[in-house]
Amino acid sequence: VAVSFINGVGGAAENVNLNSGTFDITLATGGAGRTVSISSDWNGSTASGDYVVAVNDVSSKLSVSGLAIGGSGTVTDTYGNELSATPAIPVGANLDDAENFQIDGVAPTIVSITSSSNDTTYGIGDDINVTITFSKAVTLATANLDLVLNSGYTLPVAPFSASSTAQATYEVLADHQSADLAVTGSPTLAGGATLKDNLNFFPNDLTDFTIPAGQNISDA
């Protein structure tokens, strides 16, 4: 993230000096936003700092919500003229006026595991639908997502692409028993599998495989 300084309104680029403290750029990423702080070791007409996307940061088009000089610092030009402690951003000169950065730091999660099959007793060879719903569209690649059922069977969910739901069919086999079918524990990825959302760059991994309370097959 870069800030350019000019001499007056509509003037030419001007070198300034951050004498102490920090020059703080607050980005609109939801909530209180994220602040990029530039330290006092620069002199020039442009100052820049790095923004690292954090968990739960979101923005449909990243912009700067505020500028401030922190740590009792000052910014002055070569003539000693001091910049306001809370500089205003000129109209049309914000980050989102020049760039279209979309931020999605929200990792996908499991919403529920349900079944569309009727509540009844199933015997050997009968099929039961199992549907897993995610908080956003995800892609399962390379290997399966495994659901351990309380009937003693591990149900594999096959790889799929760009969907917020995935389907699997459980066939009851000999010696399978359950008074009320449910997934035990949390689903797990088979070796080499990845489960990510569908961002164009740097997709977010699903890392919390917890099934929310009241959202298991047996709860419906």
Show which residues each predicted segment covers.
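Non-catalytic beta-sheet/beta-sandwich ligand-binding modules that flank or precede catalytic cores
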Residues: 1-220
